[in-house]
Amino acid sequence: MSVAPIDFQQVEKRYDDKLVVDGLSFHVQPGECFGLLGPNGAGKTTTLKMLLGITHPDAGSISLCGEPVPSRARHARQRVGVVPQFDNLDPDFTVRENLLVFARYFGLTAHAARALVPPLLEFAKLESKADAKVGELSGGMKRRLTLARALVNDPDVLVLDEPTTGLDPQARHLMWERLRSLLARGKTILLTTHFMEEAERLCHRLCVIEEGRKIAEGAPRMLIEAEIGCDVIEIYGPDPVQLRDELAPFAERTEISGETLFCYVDNPEPIHARLKGRAGLRYLHRPANLEDVFLRLTGREMLD
């Protein structure tokens, strides 16, 4: 695609007197995976609804696949595949029938729809489940079927709303492998997720929003270097406040989340020496990651 597949410029949305999206601007480049991150209530769902033309913005401009939204949202959606947060597969149909029926919504002939099914089943690794009812599938199988269904129109853009929520680690990794294969085919992906590892593995760039405003944007590694820039020691114990007071002089910065104290350090040795042999304490020394960035930017954990 020669134009930006997704472009938001100074978009605002109000519900009653509450501004839920506040001057949001970002664009997604062709062939990239772009992550939209934020806590519950940050405005992610409203942003996706406006992108798809389901909800109309009060100010700003949106384009999807080169089409202005909402005025030509219906045309734009012909080139978009959507994986919703919650599966909305038809439980009365088999796996094969779910794909066939959805293909007809895009105007495909019965012959063309039937021709699509085998490669989509292969992509989703569901060949052996073609004639199974949806209720017979595992959670991971349902998510892969929903992803395959989103591909029936060979979309330029995929919009994925928390695609691996509720999946076990094995199913999540298989879903990630399928998404990477789509990126290798040149698909553009807009992804919302509560899993920082997922965002770090898949996203070329990401945008963190809070209360409808963009508070950070960039490549995952760039954000980690810019916002954290050092190692992290996680300390689990009964009195994190007391630990913070004791260890703060030896850290660049400290944060408390629940019962965990995070110490951001350039030199970990002084803290290691003070923790060694302490009863009732567990600690982990690791490189900084996107979860640390989120904690730094918002002051709280991501919530499911």
Swiss-Prot record:
ATP binds at residues 38-45. It is found in: Cell inner membrane. It is an enzyme of class 7 (translocase). Residues 6-236 form the ABC transporter domain. It is a peripheral membrane protein. CDD domains: ABC_subfamily_A. Keywords: ATP-binding, Cell inner membrane, Cell membrane, Membrane, Nodulation, Nucleotide-binding, Translocase, Transport. GO terms for molecular function: ATP binding; ATP hydrolysis activity; transmembrane transporter activity. The keyword Transport applies. Its EC number is 7.6.2.-. GO terms for cellular component: plasma membrane. Part of the ABC transporter complex NodIJ involved in the export of the nodulation factors (Nod factors), the bacterial signal molecules that induce symbiosis and subsequent nodulation induction. Nod factors are LCO (lipo-chitin oligosaccharide), a modified beta-1,4-linked N-acetylglucosamine oligosaccharide. This subunit is responsible for energy coupling to the transport system. Belongs to the ABC transporter superfamily. Lipooligosaccharide exporter (TC 3.A.1.102) family. The complex is composed of two ATP-binding proteins (NodI) and two transmembrane proteins (NodJ). This is Nod factor export ATP-binding protein I. It comes from Burkholderia mallei (strain ATCC 23344).
